[in-house]
């Protein structure tokens, strides 16, 4: 403890209390005992009539000593009291009477400032920095300023993306809960669920009908032929299942648009790109495989020996989505071989699947693609169409091999357990009379399998995958038809297809539930 009015021990961080003002009442020549941190500002303080910091006097205390309390501006009271002292001070002792004390009180005038300032004088900021150890504000360099500006822009973009995601979530939620639109015939906004397909009507007498799947490059004329079949056959003897464009473009995402973005030249060899392309191809295959399963439930597995003029026609077989187009993406370098095997393993077929492979000149094919003007197909080039036709040809060559040799023999050849020439010599086939089986193997998709699995010939899983694929491919019948002579002659094209079907003894009709198939076709095409 120090005595009243006596400074403590020397400490540079302490602002010593001030002594009593001089008797002349002037602050001009008053020497302020200050610390080393505030000594440099004495010259500025002498120019003022009042101390530069707030001075508070309490009336109940004596005027000696006077303490100066620095406060931040936010805590300074709005009203200050100015005390005027008389210069001739009389010491007070115990012998003073009450009247003398009262006279001394009258001589001390306490007046209220008419317009009290917030503080007596605004102190220099350097004084506060030294007294309270306030760090000066860091001045950003040019590089730091750019980084801060970039962070703000990036934060703003993230906020914008977040708001867009919230809007997308709300729209998706409304779609899932069917709150966005109400159909005019359903006032409650409930979607018509096709539960009637779960309980198909029973047909007393199954009808023999041919299952025809139209396949080929994009824009080759499959949809045009399918739409013309009602006029050619009268409408009562044909059921048409169109391409599920609505499912590919509207359900969850637009896979048609996405697949063309994923097949840009700059995305060759990317693993993440291959995974996305695999997801798109599986989405393409989903409605085709589902429709294939549904029609198989409504048909008899036994082939009918009777002739028939009833036709069930499809725009594409699962062969295109699981085998042909993935093989084209692999040839271009967009799809990895492991993902190609996954798609080939998902290929399914049935006895009685008759695939009509339509082929057209590449130049004419490109003109048809540009003429229909689909926004997803704007980037299609003639090289794309030629490569796609070559992939269909490779699948056709593989089908010819499977038709002339057993699936087990094909697997042995693909795993280098046997040579294709040994098979052709021990078992004369139809191919040996026309083309070389070795050349046919090199032109087929099996040649790619041989090259890509040389290091994994001991894998039983790969062997089973290839065997399953060959057994599924063996079930179908492929007919190659050239469309070029029938550019504007749809009936002539159908006549050529009809003649090829009748000449092929392996193509036979199936017994089907016609009423249930009609209901399925009506529901499938309406979506």
Curated annotation (Swiss-Prot):
Region (Disordered): 1-57
Catalytic activity: thymidine + ATP = dTMP + ADP + H(+)
Keywords per UniProt: ATP-binding, DNA synthesis, Early protein, Kinase, Nucleotide-binding, Transferase
Enzyme class: transferase
Biased composition (Basic and acidic residues): 9-18
Disulphide bonds in the chain: none
Biased composition (Polar residues): 32-41
The protein's Enzyme Commission number: 2.7.1.21
Binding-site residues, substrate: 260, 281, 374
Binding residues annotated for ATP, in chain numbering: 216-223, 368
One Pfam family it belongs to: Herpes_TK
Molecular-function annotations in GO: ATP binding; thymidine kinase activity
Family: Belongs to the herpesviridae thymidine kinase family.
Quaternary structure (record): Homodimer.
Function: Catalyzes the transfer of the gamma-phospho group of ATP to thymidine to generate dTMP in the salvage pathway of pyrimidine synthesis. The dTMP serves as a substrate for DNA polymerase during viral DNA replication. Allows the virus to be reactivated and to grow in non-proliferative cells lacking a high concentration of phosphorylated nucleic acid precursors.
Name assigned to this protein: Thymidine kinase
Organism: Saimiriine herpesvirus 2 (strain 11)
């Amino acid at each position: 403890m120090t005595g009243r009015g006596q400074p403590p021990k020397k400490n540079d961080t302490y602002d010593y209390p001030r002594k009593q003002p001089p008797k002349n009442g002037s602050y001009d020549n008053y020497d302020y005992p200050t610390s080393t941190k505030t000594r440099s500002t004495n010259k500025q303080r002498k120019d003022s009539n009042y101390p530069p910091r707030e001075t508070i006097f309490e009336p109940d205390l004596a005027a000696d000593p006077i303490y100066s309390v620095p406060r931040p501006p936010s805590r300074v009271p709005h009203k200050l009291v100015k005390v005027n002292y008389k210069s001739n001070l009389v010491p007070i002792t115990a012998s003073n009477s009450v009247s003398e004390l009262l006279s001394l009180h009258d001589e001390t005038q306490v007046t209220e400032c008419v317009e009290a300032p917030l503080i007596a004088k605004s102190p220099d900021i350097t004084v506060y920095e030294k007294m309270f150890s306030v760090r000066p504000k860091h001045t950003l360099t040019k590089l730091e300023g750019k980084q801060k500006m970039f962070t703000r822009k990036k934060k703003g973009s993230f906020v914008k993306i977040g708001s867009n995601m919230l809007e997308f979530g709300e729209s998706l939620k409304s779609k899932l809960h069917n709150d966005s639109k109400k159909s005019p015939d359903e006032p409650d906004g409930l979607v018509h669920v096709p539960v009637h397909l779960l309980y198909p009507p029973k047909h007393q007498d199954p009808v023999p009908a041919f299952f025809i799947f139209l396949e080929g490059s994009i824009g080759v004329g499959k949809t045009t032929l399918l739409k013309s079949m009602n006029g050619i056959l009268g409408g009562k003897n044909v059921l048409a299942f169109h391409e599920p464009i609505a499912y590919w473009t509207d359900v969850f995402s637009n896979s048609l648009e996405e697949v063309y973005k994923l097949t840009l030249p700059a995305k060759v060899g990317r693993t993440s790109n291959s995974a996305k392309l695999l997801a798109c191809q599986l989405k393409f295959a989903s409605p085709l495989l589902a429709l294939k399963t549904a029609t198989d439930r409504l048909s008899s597995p036994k082939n009918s020996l009777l002739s028939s003029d009833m036709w069930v026609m499809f725009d594409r077989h699962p062969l295109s989505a699981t085998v042909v187009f993935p093989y084209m993406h692999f040839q271009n370098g967009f799809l990895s071989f492991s993902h190609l095997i996954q798609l080939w393993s998902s290929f399914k077929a049935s006895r009685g699947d008759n695939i009509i492979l339509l082929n057209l000149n590449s130049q004419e094919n490109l003109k048809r693609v540009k003429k229909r003007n689909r926004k997803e197909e704007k980037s299609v080039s003639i090289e794309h169409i030629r490569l796609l036709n070559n992939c269909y040809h490779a699948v056709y060559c593989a089908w010819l091999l499977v038709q002339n040799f057993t699936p087990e023999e094909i697997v042995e050849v693909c795993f280098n357990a046997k040579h294709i020439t040994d098979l052709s010599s021990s078992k004369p086939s139809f191919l040996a009379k026309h083309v070389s089986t070795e050349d046919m193997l090199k032109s087929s998709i099996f040649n790619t399998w041989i090259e890509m699995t040389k290091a994994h010939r001991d894998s039983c899983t790969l062997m089973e995958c290839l065997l399953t694929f060959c057994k599924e491919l063996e079930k179908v019948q492929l007919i190659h038809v050239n469309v070029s002579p029938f550019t504007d002659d749809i009936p002539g094209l159908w006549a050529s297809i009809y003649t090829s079907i009748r000449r092929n003894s392996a193509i036979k009709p199936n017994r089907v539930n016609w009423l249930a198939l009609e209901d399925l076709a009506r529901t499938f095409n309406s979506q």
